[in-house]
Amino acid sequence: MSRVAKNPVTVPAGVEVKFGAEALVIKGKNGELSFPLHSDVAIEFNDGKLTFVANNSSKQANAMSGTARALVSNMVKGVSEGFEKRLQLIGVGYRAQAQGKILNLSLGFSHPIVYEMPEGVSVQTPSQTEIVLTGSDKQVVGQVAAEIRAFRAPEPYKGKGVRYVGEVVVMKEAKKK
């Protein structure tokens, strides 16, 4: 049995778990997420805890039971608490402005960048150089943050660009004459 799958997922109050024909549906205050059931993994729901057991002793079944447990754990946390990613813009003239589901970025290009948020992700800009992304799906929030960062990744000489809050950019030394 997978070491990760040995620990059950505790379902907090206010989170509803339903087993469908082909998917596990988790509903909470932040929305609803579904997880497709895998044939190698059996999921049991007893006393507010979800347990994951491999249906056979193959390596793939063990791996899938741990993967399923990790993904469902993130879904339970997402629908109850939510996930947040913070980005900061470093550089002269680099600005961000949120207008509903649209993020306008000025990153030193000759044109502004207009990024439309996917379903389930909301954006806020507390200041012109800070972006806060929130949502219930950890994968989607992380993907959106990575796509925004990729517009102007931090460069290694001055550190200018879009970076995660707390990210350490290793700086290079300038060429010497």
Swiss-Prot record:
SUPFAM superfamilies referenced in this protein's UniProt entry, alphabetically: Ribosomal protein L6
Gene3D superfamilies named among the record's database cross-references: Ribosomal protein L6, alpha-beta domain
Keywords: Ribonucleoprotein, Ribosomal protein, RNA-binding, rRNA-binding
GO molecular function (one): rRNA binding
Positions of transmembrane segments: none
GO CC, alphabetical: cytosolic large ribosomal subunit
PANTHER family with a match to the protein in the record: 60S/50S RIBOSOMAL PROTEIN L6/L9, LARGE RIBOSOMAL SUBUNIT PROTEIN UL6M
HAMAP family: Ribosomal_uL6_B
Name recorded for this polypeptide: Large ribosomal subunit protein uL6
Lineage, uppermost ranks: Bacteria, Pseudomonadati, Pseudomonadota, Betaproteobacteria, Neisseriales
